[in-house]
Structures are given as structure tokens and as C-alpha cells.
Amino acid sequence: MVNQVLVHVKTSKGTWETTFQKSTRIKDVILGSRMHFRLAKEVKLVLCREESPHADFDPDRAFVNYNVLDGEVLILKEVVINGDMLNHSH
């Protein structure tokens, strides 16, 4: 379909091959991925391209704004906020 894009969303729990409308907002992709992988709602997640892991997508923009292509691999990653992850190893 011309208005749809097939993407591979990679997480630490595996990869999800799925199709979204090109007009889908990034935050809705993150929400769908969170539900698919059953990730805790407290965990802050961001989406980025596999080849540019430091350029996080803006959650309020859509796939079409980033020219996401069919078959593209996207990384869904957890954002660690300083102080949230305490080291309890001792």
C-alpha cells in the first residue's frame, strides 16, 4: 500500500515486523510496540533508526516526517533517567 510502511521494531525482547500508516505519529508507534512487547508503562521509550541510534524521533511527528522506508529497522530503546536506576548490587 502506498500509504503504509513496513518496519522492523527491534527491542531487547526481540523484533516486531509490523505495518503502520505513514501518517502514524511516533508516540503511537511506541505505544503499539509497548503493548506488543508488554513493556512496563513506567519505562520511558524512544524510537530511532538503527543506523542513527543517537537521533531519537520526536514523538509528536509522524513516519512521513522522517521518510521512513519499507523494510526499515527501527530501534525501540529504554531511556535511563539519572537517579531512576539505582545500583543495588552490593
Model-flagged regions — what are they?
Residues 1-90:
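Ubiquitin system architectures
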